[in-house]
A protein has these predicted regions:
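Small-molecule kinase domains that catalyze NTP-dependent phosphoryl transfer to phosphate-bearing small molecules
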Residues: 131-134, 139-187, 195-196
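Conserved beta-strand scaffold positions in the cores of enzyme catalytic domains, especially
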Residues: 59, 125-129, 171-173
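Conserved substrate/cofactor phosphate-moiety recognition/catalytic segment
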Residues: 44-89
Length: 197
């Protein structure tokens, strides 16, 4: 890693200054689970609920990240790791600005999720495992990815041709095939409110 020879951190406004301005604390809510499990759907519900309560938040997901800053990455193991590393670094900036950050990424291994937790900081990281079974995710298949993976058109597809490790350290586990969306959103919103106020 290249050393920054002109560090300015000691002259920047502090995290506390920014959180005081917003009247909230920053936190990273890291949603993990298979494609189609409901990560983004639950996160969007949480975002709407937090917004209605005057809480500033931002969703980071594969669509908005891979279309921009990570558009040069593929799906090899190395690229997936770099994808999550960059997301965690960006998310850390949001969190340190006092923003509730909702990150929705498959992030299929415990190592990769632990890396994100270390980058963001354990005290600012809440891991949410959307544990919807693969059969339900495949039934939903909103983007047609499971069908393409089954035909061999998508390589390294988590759950089909690449493994997904159940999280070792999830703070919350939600199966969206059993728990209604409204209940999932309420559970997470209440948990977040308790952490940031």
């Amino acid at each position: 890693m290249t050393e920054n020879i002109y560090p300015i951190y000691d002259r920047m406004m502090s995290r506390e200054d920014k959180e005081s301005l917003l009247g909230q604390k920053g936190i990273m809510i890291w949603f993990t689970g298979l494609s189609g499990s409901g990560k983004s759907t639950v996160a969007m519900g949480v975002e709407r609920e937090l917004h209605a309560r005057g809480i500033l938040c931002r969703i980071l997901d594969g669509d908005n990240i891979r279309a921009g800053i990570n558009n040069n990455l593929g799906f090899s193991e190395e690229d997936r790791t770099e994808n999550i590393r960059r997301i965690a670094e960006i998310g850390k900036l949001f969190v340190q600005t006092g923003i509730v950050t909702l990150a929705c990424f498959v992030s299929p291994t415990n190592d990769i999720r632990n890396m994100a937790r270390e980058i963001v900081g354990k005290e600012d990281f809440l891991e949410v495992y959307i544990s919807t079974p693969i059969e339900e995710c495949e039934r939903r298949d909103v983007k047609g990815l499971y069908a393409r993976a089954r035909r061999g058109e998508v390589k390294n597809f988590t759950g089909i041709s690449a493994p997904f490790e159940k999280p070792d350290h999830a703070d919350v586990s939600i199966d969206t095939s059993i728990i209604p969306l409204e209940e999932s959103v309420k559970q997470l919103t209440d948990l977040i409110i308790d952490r940031i106020k």
